[in-house]
Structures are given as C-alpha cells and as structure tokens.
Swiss-Prot record:
It is a single-pass membrane protein. The chain crosses the membrane at residues 39-56. This is Uncharacterized protein TP_0484. Keywords: Membrane, Transmembrane, Transmembrane helix. It is found in: Membrane. Its main location: membrane. It comes from the Bacteria. The keyword Membrane applies. Pfam families: FecR. GO terms for cellular component: membrane. InterPro entries: FecR, Ig-like_fold.
Length: 671
C-alpha cells in the first residue's frame, strides 16, 4: 500500500451539530492533501443541506400565502387546512391568519370556518367542504366550490364582480346579494338567499334569479333546472327565541308565496317533534290572490305554550317545507304601582322614605330598580337589586324622578321586553299641600244596586304618602240635608291607600276628599264629582239580608321548586312531579289538581293540609303541557269557603332533551 493510500485510509466523515457534515482528517502525517473526488463528495453534501433548507423555508412561505392578503379566516369549530397553487402539501391554519389569492381551503367533519374579505364580503364554509379562492384586485372576485356547502354574501357598494362557480354553473351576485351553494362538480343546488343574481349555464344561457323565488339545480351535463317553490318560510327563524305576552301567548308566522302561481290553500303544521309524528296544531289557510305582485307575504298567528316547537308549511299540491325549530317563553310586562304616574309628593316636614311597588312576575330570580333624575337614565342612576316587588328608598330630595323595573329570570335572561314603562313623579317640600285625586265613583257614574237595604258605595282616592287622615264630603243633591262629612285615619307606616264605605239611598250625589298631616294641616279638596245611585231591576224586598264574607287569600306557588320545563334529568333526580305553595292564613285544607292542558282531563285530585304535594304515578304521564291547580278552603264563620284558584303551567319533555342553538352558517336546507 502506498503512502497516499495509507493516508486516505485514515479519512473519516462524521456529523458536527454546529457545522453540518464536514470531513475530518486523522493521519499520522503532519499534512495531507484531498483529491478531486473527495472535494466533489463534500460539495454534494453541502448542496443537499442547502436544498433541504430551501424546501423548508418555501413550505413556511406557503403556509403564510404569497402577495397581499385578501382576507382572514376564522373558525367557529376546530380548524382547516390550506394548500397553495395546487401544491401537494396541506398545512394546518390558525385562527385569524391571512388568506391569499389562489388559496384552496378544506374543512373536515366538525370544522366550520368563515372568511372575511377586505371588502367586507363573507364566505361561510360548512364542514367537509373544499373551496378555491381567486380574488384578483378590485375587478374580479371568484369563489369555486369543489365539494361541500358554502354561503357567500357580497358586500353592498362594492364595484367588483362577484361570482361563485360550481361545476359548469356560474352565479353572478349584485348589490348585497347572498347565495347558498351545496354539492360539487357533478351535481349541485343553488339558492338565492338575498338580493338578485344571474345564473350562467354551460350552454351560455343567462337566467335571472330572485330572492327566495327560485332554486337552480345544475347537472353533470351542464343543464339547469329552475324550481319554483310555492311557499318559503320566513319567521320564526331557525332556533329563534320568542317572548310571548301573558294574556295572548300569540306567535306570528310569516312566509312568502308566489302570487302568480299561488295555490288556493296551505296547511300550517306545528309540532313538539321534529319528525311531526304528533301534530299539536294544524291550520288550513285560504290565501288571497294578488295578480299584480310577483311575491306576496302571508301572515298568521297561533297561541302556543312554553317550550320548543317545530313548524312547516304543507301546500295542497307539493312537498312540505323544511321544518324550522323555535322556542317560546312566556313574558309578562312589569306594571308600576306606586308612586303613580305624574304624582306629586308634597311634604311639610322631613321627607320620609319613598315606597316603590310593582306587579310580581313568575319565574323571576331578581328585580332591578333603576332610579334617575334624567328620563334617558344617562347619569345619576341609582340601582337596587331585590327579590320582592317593593322597596322603600330613603334620602330622596326635592325634584323630578324617573324609574323603571327590569326583571331577571332563572336562566339569567334580562331583556327590555320584560321591563316596565318609565314612571315619573315629583317630590316637593315646604310647599302648599296639593289636593288628592278622586278615583271612584267616577264623574257621572251610575251605580245600580239590587239590594234596597244595602246600597254600599266605596269611595277611593289616590294614596298620599304624608297623609295621616282623609276627610270625605258626600252631599245628596236631591235633598236639603247637610253634607255628610267623615274622616278615615291612616295608621302609621302603612300603605296610605284609603277608602270610605257608605250606605246611600237612591239619588244624585256629589263628593270630594281632602287629606291632613300629623300636624292637622289640611290640603285643598279634590274636584267635585257627581254620581247617581239607582235601584236595580232585580231588587226583591223578600231577599234575605246578607253580609260581606271575608275572602281567603289565594295561595302562591313557590316557583324555585317548580320548573316550567320538566326534563328527563329532573324526573330521574326527583322520581316525582313536585308542587309547592305558600300557606294561606285561616285556610284549613288545600285541593291540588293535576290536569292535561290540551284535553283538560284531570289526572289526579288530592286534598292536603300541608303546602306541598308530589305526583309519583309517572307511568301514566306522557309528554305535553299540564296545569297545577291549587285552591284554599276553610270552614270558619265569616269567611268564604274557598279561595280563588291559582294555576301553574309546565311542560314535560323526556324523549328530546334541550339542545344548544345551532350556529347560523352550518345549517343548509335544500329540497
């Protein structure tokens, strides 16, 4: 072996972390020279390192796009992947990253995204969807659906041409148009959700499309079939939450119909079930015909209870519309009691605490009282949170005040729909006392009594917080007798609503009232009011004398122990339906009745001396709406034997638990 070969046999290659692959020489000789072959190997290794680095940097550039961004992508659920210019590399995207020209985005199962473009146009992407973006400056903006479902909304006032491609079909949007597209290259469905658009097919034909009026279906061969739906549901919208009034419980339904081809009738179906296996309400509607309008809006209303509902339209000749779900909650507007509207509270002495009271509302967790010196509540607002429908607020000085009450329900809902109107009142101190307002009998009122011997008339006036005594003056205008003057005292720290009960004969009377302070300062009298007392048509002298019985106060339900919606979870936990109410003074027993709200059938009636009852026979219960009915009873002398009935409505739903509200972008219904 020559010296040269001996020296090369000692040449080794091994990696160094900081320098890459470099040759290291170990030799017994002091100096060794490399051949051209060795240098070539070294250069090849260095080129491989540079190539790998360039590929990695290019992949990073692809993940961030290229050029000026045309928008940003955001994710409702999970994330999506993207590739650039038809490259094979799919990269995972982060929320809020830029989107570039010629990007291809892909979502998987459970992934939902939205792209907000720089011109405020929006592209909603459903799961399992692939879409290609092509926005070339301000002149042309294209979106191509490869497969899946999208919703593209064009921003109003944008001069660029917005088009959506699917298969061999092109849709051109104008104005603030919005299009829903579902399908792929072979078969797709197009719906114009808002505005107008033009549809261009493979044969070069152009078809106009209008809002809700036409559905276009493109086939593999490029032909287009235009469908004319007879009816298009509008309201209630999908997963809408409706707040209905206590006295009406009315839900409005709105849909569009083609007035030029409208059918003579349509059936509105409402059910608790999505498959309409049990139809709660079915109403056949005869529709008007308007020949001058291409589309006509139809409206109707139905009384519905609380809970989740589904509705659809069934034409006389045609398929039913897609079912829409909505929820109903019963709402009762808070009514203000005291201080009365436009009341003037005058005080000679120190101003006492002001009493605020209002009507109670079912299922309320908390009331919020807002008190301000400004009508718009923009400044100087005092807020009080409480569980009872009244409160005494001290420390109010002279001036004009505005107040309202907003209830908060068990679910945390606080909405202006439930809030009261804005009340106003004034406080004055050291001024002349103002006259009270006479309420009943009203001016020129005729009181007809069937009992000759007991013509009882009740006089009332508005409450005066500072009043400690009321002075009533009643004069018979048909006789020369002196007017009847009497006083009624107001005990300290009581609600100052006072009445006078007087037995009057037939005739015409005038009356007025004044009030006095604790220092016997008397206010001016109210305006004179005239009324007439007459004998009724059914007055009998032989009618036995009767006396007024004291009415039992009706019980009140303990709402925190009685939910309005009974679910499977509740039944598994309690194994019974529970009813609880407050005790009534002088009541000796209570009757509890469980009734079916729809059929009015009595499921069970029980008598108890307690204030709670449990219905454990759940085997005979079905889903639906029910009523608890409670009535108090007594046998004490001087009391009416039974109080007024109180009713509590509730709904049982076991087979279908509450589901969260679906997001707007992911539910596309096509037929």
């Amino acid at each position: 072996m020559t010296d040269r070969r001996r020296s090369m046999s000692c040449v080794h290659f091994f990696p160094l972390k900081s320098r890459g692959f470099l040759p290291t020489l170990t030799s017994k000789k002091r100096s060794v020279k490399l051949s051209k072959q060795d240098a070539t190997v070294t250069v090849v290794i260095l080129l491989l390192i540079l190539l790998l680095g360039w590929g990695y940097s290019r992949a990073l550039r692809l993940s961030q796009g290229k050029g000026n961004p045309i928008g940003r992508v955001f994710f409702y659920k999970k994330t999506a992947t993207r590739k650039k210019n038809n490259q094979a590399l799919w990269l995972k995207l982060k929320d809020g990253v830029p989107v570039y020209h010629r990007d291809v985005l892909r979502t998987t199962t459970g992934s939902e995204a939205v792209i907000v473009f720089t011109d405020n146009s929006r592209l909603d992407i459903a799961e399992n969807t692939m879409v290609r973006i092509s926005h070339t400056g301000m002149k042309k903006k294209d979106v191509r659906l490869v497969t899946g479902a999208i919703r593209y909304a064009r921003a109003a006032g944008n001069p660029a041409a917005h088009t959506v491609h699917v298969g061999k079909t092109t849709i051109s949007l104008s104005g603030d148009g919005q299009v829903n597209v579902r399908g792929g290259e072979r078969d797709s469905t197009v719906e114009i959700a808002r505005g107008e658009a033009l549809l261009h097919d493979a044969q070069g034909q152009t078809l106009p499309l209008q809002t809700f009026t036409q559905l276009a279906t493109s086939r593999e061969d490029g032909t287009v079939r235009i469908l004319h739906p007879t009816f298009v549901p509008l309201l209630p919208d999908q997963d809408a939450l409706l707040l209905t009034a206590e006295h009406t419980r009315s839900v409005g339904f709105v849909w569009l119909g083609d007035a030029t081809t409208v059918q003579p009738s349509v059936r509105l179906q409402i059910s608790r079930y999505a498959d309409f296996s049990v139809i709660e309400t079915e109403r056949k509607l005869t529709l008007p015909h308007e020949a001058n309008a291409s589309r006509t809006t139809f409206k109707t209303s139905e009384r519905l209870g609380e809970g989740r509902w589904f509705w659809r339209l069934v034409p006389q000749n045609g398929t039913a519309s897609a079912p829409r779900s909505f929820s109903v909650r019963r709402a009762r507007k808070v009514m203000l009691h005291t201080p009365r509207a436009q009341a003037v509270l005058s005080y000679r002495d120190a101003i006492p605490p002001t009493l605020f009271s209002w009507t109670s509302v079912e299922d309320v967790e908390q009331y919020r009282l807002l008190l301000s010196s400004r009508a718009d509540f923009s400044a100087d607002v005092k807020t009080f949170s409480l569980r009872t429908p009244e409160i005494s607020v001290p420390g109010l000085g002279e001036g004009t005040y505005f107040w309202k009450v907003v209830p908060r329900f068990d679910e945390g809902i606080e909405d202006p729909v439930f809030a009261s109107e804005v009340g106003t009142f004034s406080i004055k101190q050291g001024k002349e006392l103002h006259a009270p307002v006479a309420l009943f009998p009203a001016e020129d009122e005729v009181l007809e009594h069937a009992d000759r011997e007991n013509r009882m008339v009740i006089f009332t006036c508005e409450p005066i917080p500072e009043a400690r005594r009321y002075v009533w003056t009643v004069k018979n205008m048909d006789a020369n007798a002196s007017p009847l003057v009497t006083t009624t005292s107001v005990p300290f720290l009581t609600v100052p609503m006072r009445s006078l009960r007087a037995r009057l004969q037939e005739g015409t009377y005038q009356w007025q009232v004044a009030w006095e302070t604790r220092r016997s300062d008397r206010s001016p009298y109210s305006a004179l009011r005239a009324f007439t007392v007459i004998e009724g048509m059914h007055a009998w002298e032989e009618e036995p004398e009767t006396r007024d019985l004291i009415a039992l106060r009706a019980p009140s339900f303990v709402l925190r122990d009685m939910p309005a919606l009974i679910t499977e979870k509740y039944l598994l936990q309690h194994r019974a339906l529970r009813c609880k109410w407050t005790a009534v003074h002088n009541a000796q027993r209570y009757t509890v009745t469980l009734k079916n709200k729809k059929t009015d059938a009595v499921l069970q009636t029980a008598t108890t001396t307690g204030v709670e009852f449990s219905f454990t026979n759940l085997a005979h219960l079905e889903e639906g709406s029910f009523h608890w009915v409670i009535q108090a009873h007594t046998e004490q002398e001087g009391y009416e034997p039974a109080s007024a009935q109180v009713v509590r409505a509730f709904t049982i739903r076991v087979s279908e638990l509450e589901r969260p509200r679906a997001k707007e972008i992911v539910h596309y219904e096509y037929h």
